[in-house]
Amino acid sequence: MIPNDAEGAMDSLLKEIDHEMEVTIGTIDAQEDHSKQKEETEATNQQTWKLPLQDIGDETMDMLVKHNTKNNVINPNFNKKDVDTNESPKNNNDKNVVFNDNVQLLELSANMDESVLMSTPTKSDIDISPNKVLINLGDDIANESNEDNKLPLDNKTESEDSDLVSTMLLSKIPITHTENINDFYEKKSTDIRASTSRISSVSSDIEGTPLPTTVQTDQFELLKQAMKQTFEEDNNSNIDISPLKESLLSSELKTKQNLSIEQNEETSVDSIDNSVIHNSEYEVHARSNEREEENENDFENSIEDLEISTHVIEKSPSIEAISTLDPNTDNNKEHFIINNITKDSTFIEVTSDSKIQIDLKDSPENTLHTNEDQKEANTENVASETNIKETDQVIHIPTLTEEEISTITNITNDTETTEEGSKAEEDAKNSDVSNSQNSESINTTITNSLIGIDQNLTNKSSDITNDYEEPPKENELKSSPDVIEKGHSSIEHFDDEKITNSSALGTSNYISIPLDTLQEATPVTDSGKTFELQNQDSDNINSERIQNLNGSTPVEEKFNADDELLKTNQSHITQNKDKSNINEIDNSGTTSIVSDHVVAPILPPLPKIDKIFIDDPFGEEYDISNDSIDLTKSTRPGDYLSIWHIQEEELKQVSPASTTNSQFSNRILSNASSNASAESRISSTAFKFKPRIVSRSRYINPESRVNSFNISEEMILPQLYGALDPMRRSSRMSRTIQNSIKANRQKSEQYAGTRKYSIEIQPNQESRISSRIISNKLEEVSSENDKVETMNNSITMDGSFQLLPSFLDNSFGEQLDLTFSKFAKDVLSLRSSSLAQSEIHDNSINIWGEDNFIGNTSKNNDHNAMLDSKNKLLEVTDDEKSISESINKDIFADGILKSSIFNDITVSRGLNINGLDVDLSDSESVRVSLLTAETDASESGTPIKNTVKDSHVSSPFKVVNISKWKNQDGPESDHEVEEIAEIQIEAEKSSESIADISPIKMKPFVDTVVIEEPSQTALVDAGSLYLKLKGCLNIKLTGIKHHDARYCFEFDNGRNSIQTAWAVIPSDGDIRVNHDFESTVFEVGSKLYVTLKCKYTPPKTEIVEVVEKVLIPKKKLFGKAEYKYEKRFVQRDSKKDEWNNLFARDGSFGRAEVLLDHTFLNSVKYNKRNCTFDMMNEWTRLNDKENIENVFNIPRKPKYKVADLKMEVCYLDRVSNKEVFPVSFDKCEMIIKKYKEQLLISKEGYLMQEGGDVCNNLVRRFFKLQGTDLIGYHEVSNLPVVTINMLKVIDVVSSDDLKEEEGKQRSGNSKRNFTDHVLFGGCIQLVFTDEEVINLYADTSAQEKIEWYSKLKKTVDLNICHQPWVTKLAEAQKLEEC
C-alpha cells in the first residue's frame, strides 16, 4: 500500500526497521493473503535482533537526524526544549542498518528472513517506475512548500525547512530498487486510491508554484569546466559541481519531469539500465564524515546547499554528458551521484529509468578524436617535409671554362646510340642553354657520369670473376665463327641494362654516358694504360686496372691535384708512369679525363695481399724446423683466377682464358688490335682482401726465389738411364760431364727460342678461392717483365742410354737442344696423350728437376762459385751410399699432381705447380728427403741458405738435435724428457704427423686465455655414511684363551681413521658388538677400510702330548719284561708360537674393503641395510724352520678369508652445504622422531589477527594449526584466506615472556615499561626471519591463549628438525612401514 505522502513513507520505513529488530521475523501482520503460507513455514526460524547504537552506520544516523529535524520543523506542536525528553530510548539499540560500498544505499541484513520482501505487490497493482515516484515526491514537496506560511515559525525558517524536505526526499531516500520502496510504502498504506488522488492533486498544484530563476552566467561556465575536467580524468569519475547560490527556473524543472514521464511510458520496467558515477570508497566515507560534522553543527547551511545543488543538477545543460559514459558500469544501475568539491558539498543521488542525453561539444571523446586527427595530419606533414628534404637536394656544381663546355657538348652530341646516351645529350643541351645561369650543373653531370662508368667497369670485373668460378671445359674454349666475327662489335658497347644497374649503385645524381662518346671526345693518350677516376667528395678512391686482350700490361696513371687550380674549380692531369710498382690515386678532389683507348681486363685483377707474417719468427737464419708439418699438405691456391695469372706470368704466353675462343674475349672495349705484345698483367687493386689469420705460420711462394724455367737447368734425354741418373751423381766424372753439357747449352741461341710455350692444366674442381694463399712475391714477378723466362723440363730416362766421352763437344749440345725443341712441340700438340704417362715413375715427366728437389741446397747454377759449392754438396760418404742403396730409385719423393687431363706428373718439390694442389703418392718417403736435406746441409763448409727455408711453412716447434738434447744438464732435464716423449707419442698417433721425427720441445707462441664458465657452488662432500658394526663372526684363530687375545676395529676412509677400544676376544671366536660410526664420503668411488687388529701375550710354556714307554711288572721272577705305551701331556717352555706368522707388525689380522661407488651408495641411500663383508688376511707368512729369528722376512701367503664382518649401513647424500648431519644414526632416528612429532601438532579456534595481510585493523578469523602450516579461514564463508608458514617463524613471544624479560632487566629504581603491557597484553607475537611481526589475539579465554602459545612455541622450536635429509629419510621410512 502506498502512503499518503512522502513523510508517511519515511515514518513507515523507520517504524518497519524498528519492528524488524524488535519482533521476530515470523510474527508479521497477516493482512496480505499471499504471504501467509510462507510465514507458517518460516515460523520456526525466529530470531531476535538487538543492536547497540554505536553499530548503526554514519549515513543511517545522518538520514535519521535529518528526517527527525524535518518533522520537528513542520510539526506545529514541536517544542525545541523537549527534544531530548521526547526521544525514544529504544532507538539507540534497536536499529540494525547495514551499508555496503555499492550504490544501493540501504539494504536489509543478510540474516533477516525473506518473508519481508515477499509482500511486494505485483506490477499490475501500482506503477513502480522511478519517475513516478520522483514526480509524486516532488508534488508533495511543492504542496508542502505552499502551506509553509501556516506554520508558527518565521519566514526564514520556513523556507529553509522546506528546502530540507525537498532535498532530503530527492537525495537520501533509498530508491535504487523502486519495487522494494513500494513494498515499504505498501506495508503502512491501506488506501491506494486515496494515495493516488493525493499525488494527482499535488502534481496539479505544483505547476503554478514559482521558483527562483536567477542564475549567474559565470556559474554555468564553472560547472562546464568542472564537468570537462572530470570526464577527462576517468569515465567512472565523479562530477563535481561548485555550489550555486541561485536556483533554476521551475518551468524548466517541470518540463524535465514531463519528459521523464513520457519516456517512462515508452520504456518497460525490465529494460531499465542503471549506471553509476560515484567517488571512490575513500572519498565517499570522507564526504559522509564531513556531512555528519556539518549536520551536527549547522543544519541551515546544509539545507541551503542541498537545495541549490538539487536545482543545479536538474537544470544544468552539462549534466547530459553523463550519458556518454558506459551505461553498464556498476551492475547496470542508472544512478548518477554528483558530489561537490567544496567544503559544503553533500551526497546527492539522482535516479531515472532512462538515459540522460547530454550534448558535449568539448567532450573528451571529441577531444581525443580531434587530437588524433591532428597527430595524423602532423605526421603526414612531417613525412611530406621529409620527402621534400630528401628529393630537393642542393647541388653545388663548379663552373667550367669554355673549352670544357665545348668538349662536353661534343660528348653529348654522339650519345644517340643508347638510351643513357640520349638522356645525357638532353642534359648537356639543357645545361648549355642555361649555362649563363647555372654552369655548375654540367660539371657535376660529367663527373657523376665518369664515376658511374668507373662503377660499371668495377661491376664488369666482378661479373667476370663470378662468371668464371666454374672451370672451363675443353669444348667451351672453342666458339663459333659468328661469335668471333662479332667480337669487336659486341665488345665496343656496354650492355644498356648493366650500365643502368652500375650507375644505380652510386648516388642519385649519377648519369651513365656510353664509353664510345667519351673515347671520341676525350684527348688520346697512350694505348693500353690504366685509367683511374676520382670524385671530389670521396675520401677513399678505388682504382681499376684494365688490361688489353693480348695480355699487355697497362701503364698506370696517377693524377695529382694542383692546389691553385682547385680554387678556380678547374681540373688538371698529371700523369706518372711506373712499370714496376702499383700506384693509387691521391685524394685530390679533381676529375680525370679518360683515355680514348679503354680496354676491359682480360682477367680480373688479383687482390694485393700485404705481408702479414714475420719473415723469420724465431730469429735463426738456418732454422729448418719442418718436421712438425707436412710440407706437401700445405694449402695452395686452387682457384682458376690465381692459376691463370701465375701461368701467364711464368710461361710468358697468352692464357687459355684470353684466346679468341675464350669467353673473356668479348670484354674488350676498344677498337684497337688485340694482338699487341703483352708485358705483364700482374697488378693490384685499391681494394684489398683482408685475409683471416689462422696461425702465426707464414706462407712463402718458392717460385719467387727459384726460377722454375731457367735455361741453365739440367735436361736429360728420355728413356736413358746412365751417368746422369740422380742415383749416380756420387762420381766425379758424372759431375764433370754434367758441367760441360751445361756450359755448351749456354752458348746455344737456338735453345732459348724454343722454350717459349705454355702448358694448360685443368685444376682440381674441388679447390676453393682463397685470397690468403696468394704469394707475397707477386710484385717481384711483375717487376721482371722484361726478362724472357723459359721453361725448364727434366725428363727421366731408362737404363738403355750410355753416355760417351764424344758428347762433350758443341755438336752434342746443338743436337740435344733440337731434340728438346721437338719434344716441346709434341707436348703442345698432344696435351692429353703425350703428357699422359704411365704410373711408373721411370717414364714420368719431371717439371722442375733435381735442382729444385727439397733436399738440394743449390739455388742458382749460373755462377761458377755456386757450381763449386754444389760439387762439395754432391759428395757422398759411405754412410750415404748405404742409405741410397737401401732406397729405390724414387728417392726424390716425387709428388703426384692429379688432374683430369693427364694421369700423373712427378714433382720434385711437392708444394705446388703454378698454384695447383699436389698430393704425395704412396710410394714416396718424406723421411728420406728430410734426411738428405740434413746431410747435405751438415757437410757444407760454408753455410748456404737452404731452399727449404724458402719453401717450407714456419712451425712453432723448435727442432733440437739429439746430441744437444742428451747433453742437457740440470734438474729440469728429466721433466723435459717426459714432456718430449709424450709429444712424440701424440705425434705418432696423428694422421698428419711425420714418422720418426726428432725429439722436440715446445715453445709458447700464442698467449691463450682460458675463460672458465661460472659453475655452481661445489659441495664440500658427497654426504655421510652411517655404519653400525654388528660384529665379526667365524674368526679363524686357535688358542685364543691361552694367548689372552684382545681386539679392536679401525675405520679408515683415506683421510681420517678412528679406532675402537680394546676388548677381549671371546673363546668361541665370534665378536658381537653394537658400535655406531659416521664416515664422511668425500668423493664417490673412494674406499673405506675396516681392519681387525689383535694383540696377545705369547705363552711362556706349552703343553705337549708325550707317548712314554712304561714297564709292566713281571709276574714271574725270571719272566720276560713287558712294556706299555702311555700318552700324557707335558708342560715345557715354548720355543715357537704359531701366531707369530699370522699378524702384521701393528697387529692387523683381517681387513674388509668397502668400495663406495654409485651402485653401493644407491642401494643404501636413505635405507638402512645389513651388509656382510669378508675380512681378508694378507700378512700370514710361510712356515720356515730355518729362519725363525727373522720372521718378518719370510715370504707371505696369498690373502685369504679369516672372518665375516657384519654391519648395518645407511647413506645420506648432501644437497646443500648448510646441511648438518649428526654423528650417529641413533641421533638421526631421534631427529626423525621429533620431525614426526611436529607434523602431528594441531590446534584450531578463533583468533584476532593484526599484521600480515591485515593492515591497521583487526580481523577475526578461524585458524587451524596443522604441522608447520597455520591456515586462516574467513569467519563467514569458511574459505581459506591466509596461510602462515611456521618454518619461517624464528620466535614466538607472549605477554608473559615480556614480563619475565622485564623482570630480568629491571634493577634498582628503574621504572616499569607499561607501554608493552598495553600494546602486547593478551597477544601472541610471531616474529619472522625478515623481522615482520604478526599479532594474534585469543578473544575467548586466557586458557585458550595459553594453549595457542604452547602449540605455536613447540612448532617453532622443532623447526630445527627440518632439513632436506630429514624429509627424505622420513619419507623412506614411511614407505618401508607401508
Swiss-Prot record:
GO biological process terms, semicolon-separated: axial cellular bud site selection; protein localization to bud neck
Main location: other
Keyword line: Cell cycle, Cell division
Compartment(s): Bud neck
One Gene Ontology molecular-function label: GTP binding
Ranges annotated as biased composition (Low complexity): 406-415
Disordered: region residues: 71-95, 361-441, 458-480
Start and end residues of each PH domain: 1240-1357
SUPFAM superfamilies recorded: PH domain-like
Disulfide bonds: none
InterPro entries in the record: Bud4, PH-like_dom_sf, PH_domain
Regions of compositional bias (Polar residues) in chain numbering: 431-441
Keyword hit for Cell division: yes
Gene3D superfamilies, alphabetized: Pleckstrin-homology domain (PH domain)/Phosphotyrosine-binding domain (PTB)
Ranges of biased composition (kind: Basic and acidic residues): 361-378, 420-430, 470-480
Function of the protein: Required for selection of future bud sites. Cooperates with other bud site selection proteins to recognize a spatial landmark during mitosis and they subsequently become a landmark for downstream polarity establishment factors that coordinate budding and cytokinesis. Involved in the septin organization at the bud neck.
Family: Belongs to the BUD4 family.
The protein's name in its UniProt record: Bud site selection protein 4
Primary gene name: BUD4
